[in-house]
């Protein structure tokens, strides 16, 4: 697992180099620890993988100042585990549930227990996202999502995709998008 810990740190560093997240950015994480461990999504949640992934993301948060949002599984309608201060800052209505491994998922459950004042939000519009194990986080990203390609596309046995967002380009043929 020590090798995976370093790989995860490297992946996050490479992601940040391209995504350029700043203090106050909102980052959504969808994660199947089952997939990371080599099993089918939702069948073998792993506390060890949740700990490794959360640890890397927490260090990433400390370096960048981003706010983390961990997507629950479909049994909690893909609600998001966030800090109460994040809900307040982004004016997100909270919903009532406590994620557990079999209803919320191992990752969301672990994150909930690590946070100082965890709450669940029904939905968000994040500035960027990381999807570990094809959990489908697109519903929680701002338009317009832009793929971030890094050199490694797997963590453990899980497929990893990453995205940042950009403002919509509006206007017609006369629109200008950069100052001259």
UniProtKB/Swiss-Prot annotation:
Family matches, as SUPFAM superfamilies: TTHA0583/YokD-like
Signal peptide: none
Top-level lineage group: Bacteria
InterPro entries: Antibiotic_NAT-like, DUF436
Matches recorded under Pfam families: DUF436 (PF04260)
Family that this chain belongs to: Belongs to the UPF0340 family.
Protein name in UniProt: UPF0340 protein RBAM_034070
Native organism: Bacillus velezensis (strain DSM 23117 / BGSC 10A6 / LMG 26770 / FZB42)
């Amino acid at each position: 697992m020590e090798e995976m810990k370093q790989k995860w740190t490297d992946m996050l560093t490479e992601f940040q180099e391209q995504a350029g997240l700043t203090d106050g950015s909102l980052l959504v994480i969808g994660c199947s620890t089952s997939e990371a461990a080599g099993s089918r999504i939702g069948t073998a949640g792993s506390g060890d993988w949740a700990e490794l992934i959360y640890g890397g993301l927490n260090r990433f948060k400390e370096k960048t100042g981003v706010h983390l949002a961990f997507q629950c599984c479909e049994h909690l309608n893909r609600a998001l585990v966030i800090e109460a201060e994040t809900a307040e800052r982004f004016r997100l209505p909270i919903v009532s549930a406590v994620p557990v491994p079999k209803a919320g998922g191992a990752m969301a459950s672990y994150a909930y227990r690590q946070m100082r004042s965890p709450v669940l939000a029904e939905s968000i519009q994040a500035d960027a996202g990381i999807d570990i194990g094809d959990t489908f986080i697109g519903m929680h990203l701002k338009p317009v999502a832009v793929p971030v390609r890094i050199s490694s596309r797997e963590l453990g046995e899980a497929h990893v995709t990453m995205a940042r967002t950009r403002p919509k380009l509006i206007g017609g043929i006369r629109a200008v998008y950069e100052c001259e």
